[in-house]
């Protein structure tokens, strides 16, 4: 099993898909990495040589911000928005959708489960 930037890549998946298991790498970025390193995107992870793994590791560590570094940067950006008190920061602080989605209905993922209000009756 190939290990890149602290993530074990699945053995039986194609490289194009396996690289997406790393936080910060999607399909497009995965294809860019494979093209830059000269590795076939249809090759399986288990078929990689040690040299190819080394080339991939060096490319990713040298050119991209992934995994822990990227997570820390995103958290720092959110913290900064909360501290300066901008609209997005207020939405983060209140646990509401940040990017303008409706909240009268839906938004349950961000708001959490419904809380029933005592004494509220349905009007007929």
Swiss-Prot record:
Statement: the UniProt record of this protein carries the keyword rRNA-binding: yes
Listed transmembrane segments: none
Residues covered by region (Disordered): 95-124
Gene Ontology biological process terms in this record: translation
GO cellular component, one term: cytosol
Domain of life, source organism: Bacteria
GO MF annotation terms: rRNA binding; structural constituent of ribosome; tRNA binding
Entry keywords, A to Z: Ribonucleoprotein, Ribosomal protein, RNA-binding, rRNA-binding, tRNA-binding
Function: Located at the top of the head of the 30S subunit, it contacts several helices of the 16S rRNA. In the 70S ribosome it contacts the 23S rRNA (bridge B1a) and protein L5 of the 50S subunit (bridge B1b), connecting the 2 subunits; these bridges are implicated in subunit movement. Contacts the tRNAs in the A and P-sites.
HAMAP family: Ribosomal_uS13
Family statement: Belongs to the universal ribosomal protein uS13 family.
Complex formation: Part of the 30S ribosomal subunit. Forms a loose heterodimer with protein S19. Forms two bridges to the 50S subunit in the 70S ribosome.
PANTHER family: 30S RIBOSOMAL PROTEIN S13/40S RIBOSOMAL PROTEIN S18, SMALL RIBOSOMAL SUBUNIT PROTEIN US13M
Protein name as catalogued: Small ribosomal subunit protein uS13
Organism annotation: Mycolicibacterium smegmatis (strain ATCC 700084 / mc(2)155) (Mycobacterium smegmatis)
């Amino acid at each position: 099993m190939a290990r890149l930037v602290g993530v074990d890549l699945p053995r039986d998946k194609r490289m194009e898909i396996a690289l997406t298991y790393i936080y910060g790498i999607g399909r497009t970025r995965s294809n860019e990495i494979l093209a830059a390193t000269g590795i076939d995107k249809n090759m399986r992870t288990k078929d990689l040589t040690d040299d190819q793994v080394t080339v991939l590791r060096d490319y990713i560590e040298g050119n991209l911000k992934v995994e822990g570094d990227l997570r820390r940067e995103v958290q720092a950006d959110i913290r900064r928005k909360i501290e300066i008190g901008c609209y997005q920061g207020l939405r983060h602080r209140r646990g509401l959708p940040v990017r303008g989605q409706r909240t009268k209905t839906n938004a349950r993922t961000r708001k959490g489960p419904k809380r029933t209000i005592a004494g509220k009756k349905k009007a007929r």
